[in-house]
């Protein structure tokens, strides 16, 4: 009896969501276009990462090699962005990675993904609000910081911020009110802030290359106590002395550690994927918006971080407001005010971009019954999830008040990297699943999306699917290595499911040995070399097995290229970056997940909307997406 109950609960945790994307009904307002999405992605991304985080990472982790850290972080984000683009074309609904996981790998994984997305967006909001406060404080002579240090010090080192930030709380509450007014109004404000931001960043890059010096990329240890033009009162970093000088003062390990933190700077693009029910043409606008915003952001991060470290020795950079300080260092006093004002606009856009997707993920989870139902309430006049917006703003305000910027950023990176990994795995699984031949497939589309050529091609694809049924197969070595069918079957789909799970285990093993067993590898320890080589070889073999399986021919407006290599590479990069984060970050992450599991097993599991569906309802093996293709 007990086993039967456990089996039933296990089946409930793995149930998948039924989605009918051929229906356009939504309680939200469809009013956004492609330019709105690019502005939203760029605005939400080019904020604290470029104006604040660049200084902290250059000083503490990477030095001038921060440009390489941003390059590695951009690679991880582009790989994930392509996977998001395919799912945005396949399932244009509100929920982003949460929904993608729900229709593919089941409810428990979907909850984990959604819960981590909420964490990421809350922390993104909190960290940008703290950055806004620090930049504004620098502009007016730091009276806010002095007041906090004098009257509001918290004595909980390693747990809470030394100085609470009441001004960051006020900023969050103001923008929460703006978001409740409506999507169109928020998008207009965001575009204004983003345009100013891009102009300011262009000015910073040009100024940095004009006033900067390559000598700041070639510093030696002798220069640490003798900097030209400015006395650094404290050259020491949190880890001790500021490296060994040169372009890569903390070594390549410092570059990788910096990349794990810099990854935070590219997080904003996934807010585009949460707008599926508020975009006029989601199948084309979402992929284009994601790719374009990531390209623009990488150019900006690379250029600004290079300019920053050329203008000023990396160990003299201010952790909270490096750009105004750098312009002061090179003697451009007036420019520091222009940059500070521009950075406030950028941080405002970034704050809006961080706050925008948060209530939409909460709304999607609440509507599915995994979070409390009252959070799914939508205001009749503004067509926004008003309760979710207010609740998420309140939680973000508390986080901004209590926690430090660096701690917030690292914790955010874990949740986001996990979500990105699951989306990549979902793309891999879904592209090799069998179709259901007794249904006519219809790409999710708005009325004006498909031109006649696309419609003819889609009809031709559907006709070919209806006229060719995969032959019945038996599970064997021949089936694994050389399948007979040209179309996916249940057996080939199962092979890909098992292979994807195995690859995840192998990648985790490889990354753990590489990061935690670095010293053993350096000494040539046999066990470490065996695990590293064995996991890499097996991963290559299993990737080959997936490559041999027949791929779905269903037409989408955007597909991830180079399957199965690209999603697997995305998973590897994400897991490797996760392993670069410190132990304290993992402990805080575990506490957040514990709270989430209490909510899911105490409420979500028993109130899920999928539980109310007929257990005998026909579902396709690919996650119930027949009408989404």
Swiss-Prot record:
A GO biological process held by the record: transport across blood-brain barrier
Q: Which GO terms describe its cellular component?
A: apical plasma membrane; basal plasma membrane; basolateral plasma membrane; membrane; plasma membrane; protein-containing complex
Pfam family for this entry, one: AA_permease_C
- Tissue expression: Ubiquitous.
Identify the residue ranges that face the Cytoplasmic compartment according to the record. 1-35, 83-102, 184-191, 268-287, 359-384, 430-492, 552-559, 606-629
Keywords, in A-Z order: Amino-acid transport, Cell membrane, Glycoprotein, Membrane, Receptor, Transmembrane, Transmembrane helix, Transport
A single MF term (Gene Ontology): virus receptor activity
Give the record's glycosylation annotations as residue positions. Answer: 226, 235
Predominant location = membrane
Compartments, record wording: Cell membrane
Reaction catalysis annotation: L-arginine(in) = L-arginine(out); L-lysine(in) = L-lysine(out); L-ornithine(in) = L-ornithine(out); L-homoarginine(in) = L-homoarginine(out)
| InterPro entries the record matches | AA/rel_permease1, Cat_AA_permease, CAT_C
Q: How does it assemble?
A: Interacts with TM4SF5; the interaction is negatively regulated by arginine. Forms tissue-specific complexes with ASL, ASS1 and nitric oxide synthase NOS1 or NOS3; the complex regulates cell-autonomous L-arginine synthesis and citrulline recycling while channeling extracellular L-arginine to nitric oxide synthesis pathway.
Q: Which NCBIfam families match?
A: 2A0303
This chain's protein is named High affinity cationic amino acid transporter 1
The source organism is Homo sapiens
Which taxonomic lineage does the organism of this UniProt entry have? Answer: Eukaryota, Metazoa, Chordata, Craniata, Vertebrata
Q: Which gene encodes it?
A: SLC7A1
């Amino acid at each position: 009896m007990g086993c039967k109950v456990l089996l039933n609960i296990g089946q409930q945790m793995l149930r998948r969501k039924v989605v009918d994307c051929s229906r356009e009904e939504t309680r939200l307002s469809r009013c956004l276009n492609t330019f709105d999405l690019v502005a939203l992605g760029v605005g939400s991304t080019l904020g604290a990462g470029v104006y604040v985080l660049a200084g902290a990472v250059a000083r503490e982790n990477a030095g001038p090699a921060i440009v390489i850290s941003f390059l590695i972080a951009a690679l991880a984000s582009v790989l994930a962005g392509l996977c998001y683009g395919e799912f945005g074309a396949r399932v244009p609904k509100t929920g982003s990675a949460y929904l993608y996981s729900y229709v593919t790998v089941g409810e428990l994984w979907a909850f984990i993904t959604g819960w981590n997305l909420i964490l990421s967006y809350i922390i993104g909001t909190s960290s940008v609000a703290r950055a806004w406060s620090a930049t504004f404080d620098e502009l007016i002579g730091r009276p806010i910081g002095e007041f906090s240090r004098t009257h509001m010090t918290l004595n909980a080192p390693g747990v809470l911020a030394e100085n609470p930030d009441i001004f960051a709380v006020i900023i969050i509450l103001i923008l929460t009110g703006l978001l409740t007014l409506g999507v169109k109004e928020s998008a207009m404000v965001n575009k204004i802030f983003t345009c100013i931001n891009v102009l300011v960043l262009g000015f910073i890059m040009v100024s940095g290359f004009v006033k900067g010096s390559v000598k700041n990329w070639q510093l030696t240890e002798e220069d640490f106590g003798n900097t030209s033009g400015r006395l650094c009162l404290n050259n020491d970093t949190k880890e001790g002395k500021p490296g060994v000088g040169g372009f890569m003062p903390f070594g390549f390990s410092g570059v990788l550690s910096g990349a794990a933190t810099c990854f935070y700077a590219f997080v904003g693009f996934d807010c585009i994927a949460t707008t599926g029910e508020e975009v006029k043409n989601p199948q084309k606008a979402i992929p284009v918006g994601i790719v374009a915003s990531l390209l623009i952001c990488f150019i900006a991060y690379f250029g600004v971080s290079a300019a920053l470290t050329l203008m000023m020795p990396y160990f003299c950079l201010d952790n909270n407001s490096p750009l105004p300080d750098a312009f002061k260092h090179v003697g451009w006093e007036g420019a520091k005010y222009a940059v500070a004002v521009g950075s406030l606009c950028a941080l405002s856009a970034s704050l809006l971009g961080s706050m925008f997707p948060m209530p939409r993920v909460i709304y999607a989870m609440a509507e599915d019954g995994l979070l409390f139902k009252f959070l799914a309430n939508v205001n009749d006049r503004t067509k926004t999830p008003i309760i979710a917006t207010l609740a998420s703003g309140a939680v973000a305000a508390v986080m901004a008040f209590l926690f430090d910027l660096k701690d917030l950023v690292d914790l955010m990176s874990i949740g986001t990297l996990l979500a990105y990994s699951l989306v990549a795995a979902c793309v891999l699984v879904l592209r090799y699943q069998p179709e259901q031949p007794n249904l006519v497939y219809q790409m999710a589309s708005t009325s004006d999306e498909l031109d006649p050529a696309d419609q003819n091609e889609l009809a031709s694809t559907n006709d070919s699917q209806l006229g060719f049924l995969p032959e019945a197969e038996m599970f064997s070595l021949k089936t694994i290595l050389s399948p007979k069918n040209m179309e996916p079957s249940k057996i080939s789909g199962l092979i890909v499911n098992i292979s994807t799970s195995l690859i995840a285990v192998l990648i985790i093993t490889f990354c753990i040995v590489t990061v935690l067993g670095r010293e053993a590898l350096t000494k040539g320890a046999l066990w470490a070399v065996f695990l590293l080589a064995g996991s890499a070889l097996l991963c290559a073999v299993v990737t080959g097995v997936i490559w041999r399986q027949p791929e779905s021919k269903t037409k989408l407006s955007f597909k991830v290229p180079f399957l199965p290599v690209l999603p697997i590479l995305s998973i590897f990069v994400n897991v490797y970056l996760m392993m670069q984060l410190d132990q304290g970050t993992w402990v805080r992450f575990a506490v957040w997940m514990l709270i989430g599991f209490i909510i899911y097993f105490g409420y979500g599991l028993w109130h899920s909307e999928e539980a109310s569906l007929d257990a005998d309802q026909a579902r396709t093996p690919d996650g119930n997406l027949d009408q989404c293709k």
